[in-house]
Amino acid sequence: MKRALLLVCLSMCCSLLQADEPAAGTAQSAAASDRYETRRIHDPNGIGKFYMGREIAHVMGFAGAAWLERSTREEEERLTLLIRALRLKPGDVVADIGAGSGVISMLMAEPILPGGRVLAVDVQQEMLDRLKAYCEQLGVENVEPIRGSQKRSGLKPASVDMAIMVDVYHEFEYPYEMLADISKALKPGGRLVFVEYRKEDPAVPIKEVHKMTQAQVRLEAEQPEFGLSWLETVHVLPLQHV
């Protein structure tokens, strides 16, 4: 059974992709050297590094944790609708890639009980420390913080039923390497979910480099070496694709 990728965008867009083993050898190494492009003139909100025609955005640092936890987020993004659309079930092992301070991780923790776990992955230890403190404060025992890197998630191969990235993928400095790694972490039949602000809609009040079109997500995620196959796009959120 193939692994699946679910793309979720606020005004949701869901894509399911199947992950294959990346090709190895000299040809792939040569391609890697040409994978990214640096431009001197670029969007000030981006890092000047481009991948498949898209500029990579600056990462939201620990100083932005309060924005992730803002009281108006449910009203603006309807996170409860997102969680419902994920169709989580008891016993699922779910990876929250770029978990930040754990807002999404905490929302997913209850629907997968009993027996389920959330693997909360982030590159910033300060975010993981904050998440851990929230879990202890609220008595949440099935969320496990994992320190990742710019090129590796820290997840074991074939270990998760679903991996989700909420407003995160567009900030990856090495998106190709991260997708290759995450696709390997999916169990057979597993799902990879992208949630991104809709670049198709100019009315979405987010900086342009922090948006993605559904077409761009599919272009990047459906490369043959990942073995991911698009499943569906779900339109339920006010601002994002799922």
What are these regions (language model features)?
Residues 7-15:
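Bacterial N-terminal signal peptides
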Residues 28-95:
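Class I SAM-dependent transferase core
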Residues 95, 99-152:
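Class I SAM-dependent methyltransferase SAM/SAH-binding core
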Residues 109, 176-191:
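A short glycine-rich, Lys/Arg-flanked "PGG" loop and its adjoining helix->strand segment in the class I
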Residues 153-162:
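A short acidic, Gly/Pro-enriched loop at the edge of an enzyme's catalytic core
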Residues 161-176:
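A short SAM/SAH-binding and catalytic strip from SAM-dependent methyltransferases
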Residues 191-218:
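Conserved class I S-adenosyl-L-methionine
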Residues 227-239:
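Conserved S-adenosyl-L-methionine
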